[in-house]
């Protein structure tokens, strides 16, 4: 976990850079920074991604965030602002971490795609189909999943006025 450990605390940037040094020595030019424990924050993401970019400008960085404290997408925005273009996520936010107390699921794919599209990034992903898949997965696992876009839909989703009147009563 690049952004914090529930047993050892903060992961110093220098410690993470030593790991990246080892990868770079093997001519690895792409790595994923994992937030498996859900401890990343926008400032910790910024510090580590900037340090890697400064020391290893050839290194492509991908980011893997959990939404444990509700700031997974805020961390994505920081990554986007720093030039990161690869992110890992899961349908409906499925996932977790069995060894990290309190850790919850990953950033929801449908929420991530919605954020990217609304921010002007072309993903090539059919958001409507993705939402349908997330809703189906929720039914299969038999519990409410944390995805927001799968519940609310895109911001410009239109509803019938008659349906709204019936819902209000």
Task: Briefly describe each language-model feature range.
Residues 1-169:
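Catalytic cores and adjacent flexible loops of soluble metabolic enzymes
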